[in-house]
Regions:
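Bacterial signal peptide processing site
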Residues: 9-12
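Structural motif
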Residues: 26-39, 163-172
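Tryptophan-paired
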Residues: 41-101, 172-241
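Conserved "repeat-terminator" motif of extracellular CCP/Sushi domains
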Residues: 150-157, 222, 226-228
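Structured interaction patches on ligand/partner-binding surfaces of diverse proteins
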Residues: 65, 91-147
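C-terminal motif of bacterial Sec signal peptides marking the signal peptidase cleavage site
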Residues: 4-7
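Secondary-structure boundary elements
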Residues: 139-145, 154-158, 165-176
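Structural beta-strand segments of beta-rich domains
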Residues: 18-24, 158-160
């Protein structure tokens, strides 16, 4: 996709640029009407050059893009670049690291362990990249060209479920702590330093017992966690006893 990200949309003499030559139009499910504050209250936008160096970082309030309002972007650059954006909901300070320019790795494999006791995976792990969208593009020096890039937000809500085969003995043998090792790329996660070892992520969490459903439930501490806009439910680690 050839896009102009330098110069102005005006022809002839003028005193400045009111708008950038690239407009970003945020959509959800392919239309602007579906993109509201239940999808994102703010946008964190990052631009990287072809070598992975961050060129620009912007915080875009929802008010600036609501109702399908185009967001003008102006930057002097020529060459291949990457546009990465995160949607933010609530008062979260996520400080995500962009996965741009890293090799794609499978987020479908998760390995679970609880001490020396083997557990079995009862549902696949789909990744937890909260509403991430990523586009690559080529920037040109065409100063008169005005383009609109529609960026569709894709939600990736996931759930991690582990079934303990001994049943109710879990409560006495493993009192409330589950260690989970997720193998795969961790560039899109914000992990405490003592929980990070290369591409291996170790999550340690305490569970609360839900008597009505006979489950130990804890919120996934891997950030960012996906959020279902309809229910407000976040990614959870669910252990059935």
């Amino acid at each position: 996709m050839a896009l102009s990200l330098t110069g102005c949309t005006h022809e002839g003499p003028h005193t400045g640029c009111d708008e950038g030559s690239l407009n970003l139009l945020f959509t959800y499910d392919g239309n602007t009407a579906s993109f509201d504050q239940t999808i994102a209250e703010d946008i964190e936008l990052y631009l990287y050059d072809g070598q992975g160096k961050k060129m620009d970082e912007r915080h875009i309030p929802y008010e600036n893009i609501k109702g399908g309002k185009p967001y003008p972007l102006e930057l002097s650059y020529s060459g291949n670049a990457y546009l990465v954006a995160w949607t933010l909901t609530g008062n979260e300070d996520i400080k995500k690291t962009s996965p741009a320019l890293h090799d794609d790795e499978s987020y479908s494999t998760a390995r679970f362990s609880m001490g020396e006791h083997a557990t079995r995976l009862s549902s696949a792990y789909n990744g937890s990249m909260q509403e991430l969208f990523l586009r690559s593009m080529a920037f040109t020096h065409n100063r008169q060209e005005n383009r609109i890039l529609s960026v569709d937000v894709q939600k990736q809500l996931c759930s991690i479920s582990v079934t303990i085969e001994e049943g109710s003995s879990f409560a006495t043998r493993y009192p409330g702590t589950l260690s989970i090792a997720i193998y795969g790329s961790s560039h899109s996660y914000n992990i405490a330093e003592d929980k990070q070892n290369g591409s291996r992520i170790v999550i340690e969490d305490s569970f609360a017992y839900i008597e009505s459903s006979n489950e130990y439930v804890a919120e996934n501490k891997v950030m960012p966690a996906s959020v279902d806009s309809a229910t407000g439910q976040r990614d959870n680690i669910v252990v059935t006893i």
